[in-house]
Amino acid sequence: MFREKFRKFHFIGIGGIGMSGIAKILLDMGYEVSGSDVRQNDVIKELKEKGATIYIGHDAKNVIGKEVVVYSSAISNVNEELLKAKELGLQVISRGDMLADLFRMKEGIAISGSHGKTTTTSMISHISHIAGLDPTVLIGGILQTFGSNAVLGKSELLISEADESDGSFLKLNSVINVVTNIDKEHIGYYKDYEDIKEAFVKFINNVPFYGASVVNIDDTGVRSILSKIHKKIITYGIESGDFQAKNIVFNSDNTRFDVFYKGIKLNTIELQIPGIHNVYNALASIAVSTLMEIEQPVIRDALKSFKNAKRRIEFVGEKNTNLIYDDYGHHPTEIKSVYEALKSKYKDKNIVVVFQPHRYSRTYYLIDDFVDLFKSLDKVFLLDIYGASEENTFGISSLDMINKVSKEECVYIPSKEELFDRLDELKDSVIVFMGAGSIGQWSHEYAKT
């Protein structure tokens, strides 16, 4: 009754992957949706096709006649639409609060962690879909199962990524929480690593008495907080865990491993995606699916048919005898995982990482981790930092990393044109474009030139 009072939603920054997902769900629920962003992209095109009114550019008049205004964390406090909405007395809420409201309407599974959220959420969603559970899904990427980052299901089940970057994951009323790992990330929001870990303690302890959290026991960050957890946890890992992967084999076309639960073999799993990190992601999805009482043969068959979300070790094509991949990874841990995954698949090829650093703050705080990593890779083409919404108050640049690496195989590339020329010189290599900024379309553009 009360929620029907509000029918007209406006999203400031609607083109973002998280904002667009919520907007799609509301459209499918029958609400009127409009939104603004600074540029067109594929998700905006999909929103238009679904019936959303989209404005390119922000303007105060865009919020007139709306009832609820949702804004993303990337939106400035002095954004003209945000200020006008407050002046008009409209309901103004953050993306995190809007997601929390969706969780109140459903029984939720929230997947968090510094790395692996999108793939783990995608796996759980795919298994649930194959099992006929008809979930509502919100993912930080385009899942090939649905061809979208959001799907409205008919059941009470909601499966969603939970964003720790701004602390909004603590607002979610979920029945099952997943923590894939806890790493040094989002230092611009959190005071330090200990502050990040405390947030995850609260997240895990947020589950109700009838719920549980599924956590990666092999991760040092997770292990360091276990003494502070007073709610039910289920662990997974390779070294140990309630759910454990053993007999792992990396082949050129698949990854195989056996799954054990408390010492008893449950299944033999075959994945079509490479990497030890995806074994961990699969273990998390198996643990959650088992909690949901999905039969083991269904889990096995679903994971065998699973295709990862776009920009997650996504194969783009072949050019000049080189294989081209694309990945969203922008943290040293993620780059290392992707590099090792491709090495396990292409043991005799050079892996060339084309990396666009994302945010000045992340580059500044993690520069030593980036430098140590780059020293160990076959070859790195390093682009300028993509600042996102940040000003460069840190005085940091990609050349600072180049100077610290001091390695011939780590090269600064100042432009896309020069990058493409340098890539054309390579033969029989695996090229992976990595980053969360404007590099997102470069791999496809290069493959077509």
From Swiss-Prot:
ATP binds at G113, S114, H115, G116, K117, T118, T119. It comes from Hydrogenobaculum sp. (strain Y04AAS1). It comes from the Bacteria. Keywords: ATP-binding, Cell cycle, Cell division, Cell shape, Cell wall biogenesis/degradation, Cytoplasm, Ligase, Nucleotide-binding, Peptidoglycan synthesis. One of its GO terms (cellular component) is cytoplasm. This is UDP-N-acetylmuramate--L-alanine ligase. It is found in: Cytoplasm. Belongs to the MurCDEF family. GO terms for biological process: cell division; cell wall organization; peptidoglycan biosynthetic process; regulation of cell shape. It holds the Pfam family Mur_ligase. Pathway: Cell wall biogenesis; peptidoglycan biosynthesis. InterPro entries: Mur-like_cat_sf, Mur_ligase_C, Mur_ligase_C_dom_sf, Mur_ligase_cen, Mur_ligase_N, MurCDEF_pg_biosynth, UDP-N-AcMur_Ala_ligase_MurC. It catalyses: UDP-N-acetyl-alpha-D-muramate + L-alanine + ATP = UDP-N-acetyl-alpha-D-muramoyl-L-alanine + ADP + phosphate + H(+). It is an enzyme of class 6 (ligase). Cell wall formation. Its EC number is 6.3.2.8. One of its GO terms (molecular function) is ATP binding. The gene is murC. NCBIfam families: murC.
